[in-house]
Amino acid sequence: MIKGYCDDRFLKIKNIFSNQINNGYELGCSVAVEYKGKEVINLYGGYTDESKTNLWKKNTLVNVWSVTKAVTGVCIAKLISENKLDVNNKVSYYWPEYDC
């Protein structure tokens, strides 16, 4: 079962997302997209475990592996170009809990 929000303009993405879970290509997952500063997709569904006893929830935490390095790099470059991120600052400047 897929939950969340999807703007009608992006229903094709919702259908692809649903098919991935319903056809067993993904056990569980989530996707969120902002377009022109507004949330247009925030979907989640499936399970967090192979025994299918724990549903994927809106706030399910997941590890971010190597597949996201390119996207993360582009986001960081954009923040630097907008003077919203200074590479000379420590991580704890932006994320105080990291300094614990």
What are these regions (language model features)?
Residues 5, 9, 63-68:
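Extracytoplasmic/periplasmic, Sec-exported soluble proteins
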Residues 58, 63-67, 81-100:
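Active-site helix/loop module of the DD-peptidase/beta-lactamase fold
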Residues 2, 9-22:
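Short, basic/aromatic recognition patches
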Residues 18-55, 87-89:
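A short, well-structured edge-of-sheet supersecondary motif
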Residues 14, 18, 77, 91-92:
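Non-transmembrane alpha-helical segments in soluble domains
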Residues 70-75:
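Short amphipathic alpha-helical face segments that pack within enzyme cores
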